[in-house]
Amino acid sequence: MKMADGSTILRRNRPGTKSKDFCRWPDEPLEEMDSTLAVQQYIQQLIKRDPSNVELILTMPEAQDEGVWKYEHLRQFCMELNGLAVRLQKECSPSTCTQMTATDQWIFLCAAHKTPKECPAIDYTRHTLDGAACLLNSNKYFPSRVSIKESSVTKLGSVCRRVYRIFSHAYFHHRRIFDEFEAETYLCHRFTHFVTKYNLMSKENLIVPINVGENAAPGESEA
């Protein structure tokens, strides 16, 4: 992208850039982004502009491949969820949260093991985000950031279900941390709208009360 005087905009932070000036380059239309990472950059651009404008962030541009759009959003959610995981470490430990739970109705089993089993909540969080990163960066299932096979797109739903449990645990057991993080990022709000819009999760599993009032049924949930 070039400025009016013909000079090229360097879209990266130069050495010595102050934190308040990070990523403060002009917005660029998606169609002018010449990169295989264009969709990711476009989504991050919208988030940086106004994280509360969930509807705009989730509005898919014309002619955009829907599979790639969903994939890139889920990658972005997982990257941002690491920020919540870091904050949770302040009070969520194997001794304080021995199981991954939300309400008393559910105990979530961790899929990172050969046979899904119970994990302390903070370990479940780490395992889930690590597993999601491994899958979403897999050359076997997602060799391209430009087009994605439908058989690979179908794997996104299971990732959504697992990472959503991080939101639900934080909401029901670490409400102050959840509220502070959500006030800054609107991440759970955006995620809830995303999975609802693209039917990636059933509404009865969306137990954090963001435009969803249903509760989960009693039981034990496997990965």
From Swiss-Prot:
GO cellular component, one term: FAR/SIN/STRIPAK complex
Biological process (GO), any one: neuron projection morphogenesis
Region of interest (Disordered), residue spans: 1-21
Positions with a binding annotation for Zn(2+): 92, 97, 169, 174
Molecular function (Gene Ontology), one example: metal ion binding
Source superkingdom: Eukaryota
Keywords: Metal-binding, Zinc
InterPro entries: MOB_kinase_act_fam, MOB_kinase_act_sf
Family, per entry: Belongs to the MOB1/phocein family.
PANTHER family in the cross-refs: MPS ONE BINDER KINASE ACTIVATOR-LIKE MOB (PTHR22599)
Name of protein: MOB kinase activator-like 4
Source organism of this protein record: Drosophila melanogaster
Name of the encoding gene: Mob4
